[in-house]
């Protein structure tokens, strides 16, 4: 299947996602998965990672009692790396490129913002000189962002569950030393924030109901 047809399939799935979420559907994560699969299924480890994050977010949304926001978290988890898809690359910063694509296709803004800000994107955007581009999106509620980020940071590149420390180590090894993720301890700052007072002592996000 050509990249053009994959793009169209993803766009159609996102329009369906938007209608489902506007109508209060509780099964819209399947449309988010379809959109991600259309654009990422040919990317090997990237797609396996996304599948793992989707599964992790599903578990966390249930365990942490996020209520009606659970479908938003699940959708954002499936879509968090969609900006890596070659047809979407513009700035080269996948949270922004992905969020722009989602917004252009009518995805609810809360899902868009979770994709834009996931896993310390605010720190990396500053290092890349893309803070203004990221600021085009509103910051999402921290308790929802933490769920998506924790799911991402506890899923390895092949989709297997890993510790946050293992995942951060893998990221640092994978990116060259001149990458923005190495500057000023960006990855370390991300880890510290995920394990800060906003989460449990082990870095796991707090149940939303207890906040």
Segments the model singles out, each with a brief description of its role:
Residues 2-26, 38-67, 79, 105-107, ...:
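Divalent metal-dependent phosphate-bond-processing catalytic cores, especially two-metal-ion Mg2+/Mn2+ enzymes
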Residues 28-30, 49, 71-74:
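N-terminal glycine-rich anion-binding loops that anchor highly charged ligand groups
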Residues 69-102, 112-122, 152:
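His-Asp-centered metal-binding catalytic motifs of divalent-metal-dependent phosphohydrolases/nucleases
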